C-alpha cells in the first residue's frame, strides 16, 4: 500500500500536464490584457449612451401608441413601417428602442385583437398588421394607412396599392334580398282590375326580380337573358290581358327601379372603391346587352309596358356606364390629390385665377342671375380653396360635391314639386360654364398644374352628372309610385286593350320590334257578365283579322275559322273564353292570342315561392271568382317545351298548324326563327341551352335559391374573372 503511494509518476503524463499548465497561463495573461482594453472601451460607450438616451419605457410607448393609432377594420400597415414610426418616436424622445420582436409584444398589449397577414406577390410578400390605422391627428397620418384610405403596400410600405385588400367581388353580397315591393292593398285599383290578379303578378314579378339579382351577384350574367325570356314569353295566358293596364305598367316601373338600384349597389357599392379591369369590362358589356335582351323578351307585349321597361333599363345602363368611367377617374385622381407637391402647385395656380372675370362670364349664361348666385359661386370657390390648402383626401372632395348638389339642386327643387329637371339643368349650366372658364384661364397662363386640374375637372364633371342622373331616376320612380297609388292627375285614366295589328312583310333582315299596324279590325262582343257598371279600365277587347307571327320581320294574315274575311267584321272567339266587360275602348294585348291552339302552352310554375320568401301564400292558386273560364286550381306547366311544341330553330313556322287544311299558306318562304343564334359557350355570355341543361330536368325552374355545387360551375361558361374554388369565388380580379 505504501509502495503504491510512493510509486513514481509516469513521465509522459507529467510532461503533458506541465505543457497544459503553461498554455493556460499564457491564455489567461492574453485574455487579461484583452479584457482590460474591452472594459475601457465598453465603459466609454456606456458613458456615451447614458449621455445620449434614456432607458426604454414601456408605459411611454403604450401612451404613444394610444395617441397615434386606432382599431380600424380592413386597414393594413406593414410591420416595417410601424417599427420605423417607433424608431422615430424613440429618436425624438432620446429613448433606447427595443428590437422589432419586443416592439411587437408591446403593440399587442395595447391592441390585443390585432392580427398579422402576409401580403404581396409571390417572393415579394411582407408581414402587415391587420386591423390598425393611423389616426388623422397623428404626425404619421397617411391616407393609405387610415380609415379613409385603402391599404397600400410596397417595398417602402407606402406607395403601391395592395390589390389583395381592395379588390371587390359582388359575391360578397350573396343573400341580398330586394326591398319590399308595392302592396296591392295600398294601390288605388279600378273596380274592373281584379285585385287577385294584380297580387299574383306582383308576387310573380318579385320572384323574377330576386332571381335576376341573385344571378348578378353570382356574376352569371348570361343567365339574365334566359330569365327575361322565360318570364315574359312564358307568361300565363290568363295574365296577359292585365299587362296593358296602366296600373300594372306603373307597378312594373316601380319594381324595376327597386331592382336596378339594388343591382347598382351590389356591382359598385361606391365609386371610390377600386374595381378590377375584368369586372369593369363585364359590367359595361352587361349594360350594353341588357337593352337587346329586353327587346327580344318583350316582343309582342303591350306597347306601354315595353316603353316603361325600355326607358328604365336605358337609364340604368347609362348609370352603370357612368359609374365605371367615374371609378376609373377617381383612381387616377386619387394619386394626384394625395401628392403634397402637386396639391401645393394646384393651390398656387388656383389662387392666380381671375375669379371676378370668370364669375361675370358664368352669370351671363343664367336666365335670371341674382346677387345670391354670385355669392354661391364665391362660396364654392373658397370651399375648394380650403380643400386644396388642407391637402384633403379624395373622400373629402366627394363629400363636398355631395353637399353642393344637395343644397344647390335637391333643396331648391324640394320647394316646388316637379321642378327638379329645370333646377338641375340650370345648375349644370352654371357648373359647366364655370369649370370651362377656369380651365381656359389656366391654359392661357400656362399653369404648371394644368394637367392635374384637367383630370380633377373631368372627375368632378362625371360625379356631378352621376348624382343628377341618380336624382332623375329617383324622381321618375316617385312619379310612377304616385301614379300607381292614384295620386297623380285627377283625370280619369282610360286604358286601351288593343290587339297588335299586322304590318306588310319587310325584306329587311334587321329585327323589327315596333308593333305592326293594319287597317282592318274586328270587334269582339263580350259574353254576358254579372258586372253591371264596368270601369274604363280593363274594359274592352278587339282583335284584328291580321295576326303577326312570332317572327321579327315576316308577318302572316290569319283568316277567321269560318273562312270569312276580316272586312265582314265577323266575330272571333275570345282567347280562353275569358270574360271581358263590354266597352267601346280597345286595348293592346300580345300577339299571338290563340297560342294554346297552336302548341304555345308554356308558362311558369311558381309553386316554390313560399319556400323562397316568407310571404304567406299557397303553392297553387285557387280559381279566381271573376274568371268564369277557369274552373279548377291553376297549375302552370313548365316552360321547357318539347321541340314539337315550340321549335325554336325549326325552319317551319309555328303558325303552320293553323294554316293547314283549307287555309292556304300566304308565304312560301321559311319563317325566320324567333331567337337569333347566340354566342358559343366559349364567350362571356352562353346560350340558353346552358340554362336548359341545368334546369331542364326540373318541372319548376323557380326552385328555392340555394348555393350551387362546385361541379356546376363550368369555368369556360363564365366570364374570365371568377375562379370557383370549394363553392366560393376566389376572384381573378385581384390579380
From Swiss-Prot:
Claim: Iron-sulfur is one of the keywords in the record: no
InterPro entries: DNA-bd_RFX, RFX-like, WH-like_DNA-bd_sf, WH_DNA-bd_sf
GO CC terms, sorted: chromatin; nucleus
Region ranges (Disordered): 27-59, 504-540
GO biological process: one example: regulation of transcription by RNA polymerase II
GO molecular function: DNA-binding transcription activator activity, RNA polymerase II-specific; DNA-binding transcription factor activity, RNA polymerase II-specific; RNA polymerase II cis-regulatory region sequence-specific DNA binding; sequence-specific double-stranded DNA binding
Compartments in which it is found: Nucleus
Keyword DNA-binding part of the UniProt annotation: yes
Chain positions covered by the region annotation Necessary for dimerization: 315-487
Residues of the DNA-binding region: 44-126, 61-136
Coiled coil, from the record: none
Polar residues: bias regions: 32-41
UniProt note on tissues of expression: Isoform 1: Expressed in brain and gliomas (at protein level). Isoform 2: Testis-specific (at protein level). Isoform 3: Testis-specific (at protein level). Isoform 3: Expressed at a higher level in adult testes and ejaculated spermatozoa than in fetal testes. Isoform 4: Testis-specific.
Keywords assigned by UniProt, alphabetized: Activator, DNA-binding, Nucleus, Transcription, Transcription regulation
Subunit structure: Homodimer. Heterodimer with RFX2 and RFX3. Interacts with GPS2.
Membership in a protein family: Belongs to the RFX family.
PANTHER family per record: RFX TRANSCRIPTION FACTOR FAMILY, TRANSCRIPTION FACTOR RFX4
Function: Transcription factor that plays a role in early brain development. May activate transcription by interacting directly with the X-box. May activate transcription from CX3CL1 promoter through the X-box during brain development. May be required for neural tube ciliogenesis during embryogenesis.
Protein's recorded name: Transcription factor RFX4
UniProt source species: Homo sapiens
Underlying gene: RFX4
Amino acid at each position: 500500500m505504501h509502495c503504491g503511494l510512493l510509486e513514481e509518476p509516469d513521465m509522459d503524463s507529467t510532461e503533458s500536464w506541465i505543457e497544459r499548465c503553461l498554455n493556460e497561463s499564457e491564455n489567461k495573461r492574453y485574455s487579461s490584457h484583452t479584457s482590460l482594453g474591452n472594459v475601457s472601451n465598453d465603459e466609454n460607450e456606456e458613458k456615451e449612451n447614458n449621455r445620449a438616451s434614456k432607458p426604454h419605457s414601456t408605459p411611454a410607448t403604450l401612451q404613444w401608441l394610444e395617441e397615434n393609432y386606432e382599431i380600424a377594420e380592413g386597414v393594413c400597415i406593414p410591420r416595417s413601417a410601424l417599427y420605423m414610426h417607433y424608431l422615430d418616436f424613440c429618436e425624438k424622445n432620446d429613448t433606447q428602442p427595443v428590437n422589432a420582436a419586443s416592439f411587437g409584444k408591446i403593440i399587442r398589449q395595447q391592441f390585443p385583437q390585432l392580427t398579422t397577414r402576409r401580403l404581396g406577390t409571390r417572393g415579394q410578400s411582407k408581414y402587415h398588421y391587420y386591423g390598425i390605422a393611423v389616426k388623422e391627428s397623428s404626425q404619421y397620418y397617411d391616407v393609405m394607412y387610415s380609415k379613409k384610405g385603402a391599404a397600400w403596400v410596397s417595398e417602402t410600405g407606402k406607395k403601391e396599392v395592395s390589390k389583395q385588400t381592395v379588390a371587390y367581388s359582388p359575391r360578397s353580397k350573396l343573400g341580398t334580398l330586394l326591398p319590399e315591393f308595392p302592396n296591392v292593398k295600398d294601390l288605388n285599383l279600378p273596380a274592373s282590375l281584379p285585385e287577385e290578379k294584380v297580387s299574383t303578378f306582383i308576387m310573380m314579378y318579385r320572384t323574377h326580380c330576386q332571381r335576376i339579382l341573385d344571378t348578378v351577384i353570382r356574376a352569371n350574367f348570361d343567365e339574365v337573358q334566359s330569365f327575361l325570356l322565360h318570364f315574359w314569353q312564358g307568361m300565363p295566358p290568363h295574365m296577359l290581358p292585365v299587362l296593358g293596364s296602366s296600373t300594372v305598367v306603373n307597378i312594373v316601373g316601380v319594381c324595376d327601379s327597386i331592382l336596378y338600384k339594388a343591382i347598382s349597389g351590389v356591382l359598385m357599392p361606391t365609386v371610390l372603391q377600386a374595381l378590377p379591369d375584368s369586372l369593369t369590362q363585364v359590367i359595361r358589356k352587361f349594360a350594353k346587352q341588357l337593352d337587346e335582351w329586353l327587346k327580344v323578351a318583350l316582343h309582342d307585349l303591350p306597347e306601354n309596358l315595353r316603353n316603361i321597361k325600355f326607358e328604365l333599363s336605358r337609364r340604368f345602363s347609362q348609370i352603370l356606364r357612368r359609374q365605371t368611367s367615374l371609378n376609373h377617374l377617381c383612381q387616377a385622381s386619387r394619386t394626384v390629390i394625395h401628392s403634397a407637391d402637386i396639391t401645393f402647385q394646384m393651390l398656387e395656380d388656383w389662387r392666380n385665377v381671375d375669379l371676378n372675370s370668370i364669375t361675370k362670364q358664368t352669370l351671363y349664361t343664367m336666365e335670371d342671375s341674382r346677387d345670391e348666385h354670385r355669392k354661391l359661386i364665391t362660396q364654392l370657390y373658397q370651399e375648394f380653396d380650403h380643400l386644396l390648402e388642407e391637402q384633403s383626401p379624395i373622400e373629402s372632395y366627394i363629400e363636398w360635391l355631395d353637399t353642393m348638389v344637395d343644397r344647390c339642386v335637391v333643396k331648391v327643387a324640394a320647394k316646388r314639386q316637379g321642378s327638379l329637371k329645370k333646377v338641375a339643368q340650370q345648375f349644370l349650366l352654371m357648373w359647366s360654364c364655370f369649370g370651362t372658364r377656369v380651365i381656359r384661364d389656366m391654359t392661357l397662363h400656362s399653369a404648371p398644374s394644368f394637367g392635374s386640374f384637367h383630370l380633377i375637372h373631368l372627375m368632378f364633371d362625371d360625379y356631378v352628372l352621376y348624382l343628377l342622373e341618380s336624382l332623375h331616376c329617383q324622381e321618375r320612380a316617385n312619379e310612377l309610385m304616385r301614379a300607381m297609388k292614384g295620386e297623380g292627375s285627377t283625370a280619369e285614366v282610360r286604358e286601351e286593350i288593343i290587339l297588335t295589328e299586322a304590318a306588310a312583310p319587310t325584306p329587311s333582315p334587321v329585327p323589327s320590334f315596333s308593333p305592326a299596324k293594319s287597317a282592318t279590325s274586328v270587334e269582339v262582343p263580350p259574353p254576358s257578365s254579372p258586372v253591371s257598371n264596368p270601369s274604363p279600365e280593363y274594359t274592352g277587347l278587339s282583335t284584328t283579322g291580321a295576326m303577326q307571327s312570332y317572327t321579327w320581320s315576316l308577318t302572316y294574315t290569319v283568316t277567321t275559322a269560318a273562312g270569312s274575311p276580316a272586312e265582314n267584321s265577323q266575330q272571333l272567339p275570345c282567347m280562353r273564353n275569358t270574360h271581358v266587360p263590354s266597352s267601346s275602348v280597345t286595348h293592346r294585348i300580345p300577339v299571338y292570342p290563340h297560342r294554346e291552339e297552336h302548341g304555345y302552352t308554356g308558362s311558369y310554375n311558381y309553386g316554390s315561392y313560399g319556400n323562397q320568401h316568407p310571404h304567406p301564400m299557397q303553392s297553387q292558386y285557387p280559381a279566381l271568382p271573376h274568371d268564369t273560364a277557369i274552373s279548377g286550381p291553376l297549375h302552370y306547366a313548365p316552360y321547357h317545351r318539347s321541340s314539337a311544341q315550340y321549335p325554336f330553330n325549326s325552319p317551319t313556322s309555328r303558325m303552320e298548324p293553323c294554316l293547314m287544311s283549307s287555309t292556304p299558306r300566304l308565304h312560301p318562304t321559311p319563317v325566320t326563327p324567333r331567337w337569333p343564334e347566340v354566342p358559343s359557350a366559349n364567350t362571356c355570355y352562353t346560350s340558353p341551352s346552358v340554362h336548359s341543361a341545368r334546369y331542364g330536368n326540373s318541372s319548376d325552374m323557380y326552385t328555392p335559391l340555394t348555393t350551387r355545387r362546385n361541379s356546376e360551375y363550368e369555368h369556360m361558361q363564365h366570364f374570365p374573372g371568377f375562379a370557383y374554388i370549394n363553392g366560393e369565388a376566389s376572384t381573378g380580379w385581384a390579380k
